[in-house]
Design a protein with these regions (language model features):
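N-terminal secretory signal peptides and thylakoid transit peptides that target proteins
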Residues: 2-18
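N-terminal cap/lid segment of alpha/beta-hydrolase-fold proteins
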Residues: 153-191
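Cap/lid segment of the alpha/beta-hydrolase catalytic domain
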Residues: 199-265
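Hydrolase active-site cap/lid region
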Residues: 286-334, 352
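Short beta-strand/loop motif that positions the catalytic acidic residue
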Residues: 350, 356-358
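Short alpha-helix in the alpha/beta-hydrolase fold that links the catalytic acid
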Residues: 366-375
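Catalytic histidine-centered segment of alpha/beta-hydrolase-like enzymes
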Residues: 388-402
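Catalytic active-site module of serine/aspartate enzymes centered on a nucleophile-bearing elbow/loop
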Residues: 398-423
């Protein structure tokens, strides 16, 4: 049985800093992030350290990130979120599920009441909250947990109900991927009906779902004049849970299907399509760019060169989740399969602009992998920026919103030549 933990201990563990230095040497192209305004960063100490050194506590199942996410309560003023933080028991995944489900159901019921009274805006707001909280409850659950699928469906139902109350700021899209249908969402700025927008494709992380992405991170790109498409890839969201589709070692096939779709839209400038990656997408994004040449720029938070070395081995608590995502039978099979999930021999095929974000104290993705990617992508217009690892570890990405620098979004705006006036 794990020892009791104080809030101070949780914060201390969650914010532990890695400092095993590997002094970087810029090769050919300066690593200074020239296109980021006052947020410029230079390549220096990369970091990276063994998980047992970074976090002395016992890792939890469900992707292994529960104990990390406990530190986020300090960055919210939401009453329901603070209540969950106060009530959830340390090292207890069941408590995590119970407390998030409790506030989700509360908001779901409130939304039903407001809807019955014809108060559609308020009902929509509470359905959105319910969707968010159901998502928090369900994302750590493994495929074997009987609560996983019903919880995921409740999340989707709340999301759909919110859209029935008030017209959402996005449209639903369906992508034909090799005979399978991938569902997602497209969001764009305002502007003249005939305007064509530069467009961002999101390559999400292991636990991210398109519903959260289109309502969350998409907004900062739309505000800068870019359209945004969020689709759950195989290995994510609905394709994983409802269709049993897994992430392949060549995700450029998925990105190709999305670009093919975007080229059919009259409101998309197909000559200005960018691809962003977060977490596990920090590997998939550069891998896709090695083959999909219609992508004009790529940028990553937690860039990665080799998914096996940079994630599976670096952060053992996530191994079971990775096994599920790639469709392996067991951990040994996962390790064998992951030999193909690499940019070895391919990184030099990246020819577009590339920004590699990393966090020197990132506990989930090895920052050394970001540097290996930077070193190997010799034909890209490459840049590198610190403070862009997993968001629980640094103020730029995970601190109070007023202190965060929108480094990735501003860089993308410049690379895709977006017009902020059109937003």
């Amino acid at each position: 049985m794990a020892p009791p933990v104080s809030r101070r201990h949780v914060m201390k563990w969650g914010l532990a800093s890695a400092s095993a230095p590997a002094l970087a040497r810029a090769l050919g192209v300066s690593a200074a992030a020239q296109d980021l305004g006052p947020a410029k960063g230079k390549l220096g100490v990369i970091g990276g350290r063994d998980e047992k050194v970074l976090f002395p506590g016992k890792g939890l199942p469900g992707g292994g990130q529960l104990e990390i996410r406990l530190v986020q309560s300090m960055y919210t003023s939401d009453a329901d979120e603070l209540e969950v933080a106060q009530r959830a028991r340390p090292y207890d995944p069941d408590s995590w599920y119970t407390e998030w489900t409790r506030v989700a159901e509360k908001n779901d019921q409130l939304a039903d009441g407001y809807a019955a009274e014809g108060l559609k805006v308020t009902a929509s707001e509470h359905y959105r909250r319910a969707q968010d909280f159901y998502g928090n409850a369900v994302w750590p659950l493994p495929e074997s947990d009987q609560r996983m699928l019903p919880g995921y469906k409740k999340m989707r139902e709340a999301f759909d109900k919110a859209g029935q109350m008030v017209r959402p700021p996005f449209e639903r899209v369906k992508i034909n991927f090799e005979g399978k249908t991938l569902e997602g969402y497209f969001r764009k700025p305002g502007g003249a009906p005939a305007k064509k927008f530069p467009t961002v494709i999101a390559f999400q992380g292991a636990d991210t779902m398109a519903e959260n992405t289109i309502l969350g991170g998409a907004g900062s790109y739309v505000a800068r004049g870019m359209a945004f498409v969020a689709v759950d890839f195989p290995g994510q969201g609905g394709p994983l849970r409802l269709q049993d589709l897994h992430l392949p070692p060549d995700p450029e096939r998925i990105v190709k299907a999305i670009v093919d779709y975007l080229e059919t839209r009259p409101d998309v400038d197909a000559t200005r399509i960018g691809l962003m990656g977060i977490s596990m997408g920090g590997w998939g994004t550069p891998r896709a760019a090695t083959a999909e040449k219609r992508i004009k720029a790529i940028w990553m938070a937690a860039g990665s060169y080799d998914l096996g070395a940079d994630l599976f081995d670096y952060y053992p608590p996530i191994q079971e989740r990775v096994r599920w995502i790639i469709g392996a039978r067991d951990l040994a099979d996962a390790r064998r399969k992951l030999r193909e999930y690499t940019l070895e021999g391919r990184a030099d095929k990246i020819e577009c602009a590339m920004l590699v974000g990393y966090g020197g104290d990132d506990r989930i993705m090895d920052p050394q992998g970001a540097y290996r990617l930077y070193q190997a992508a010799v034909n890209a217009k490459r840049q590198m920026l610190a403070g862009l690892g997993h968001p629980q570890h640094n103020v730029r990405a995970g601190g109070p919103r007023g202190e965060r620098a929108a480094s990735l979004q501003d860089w993308a705006m410049k690379q895709l030549r977006a017009d902020v006036e059109s937003s």
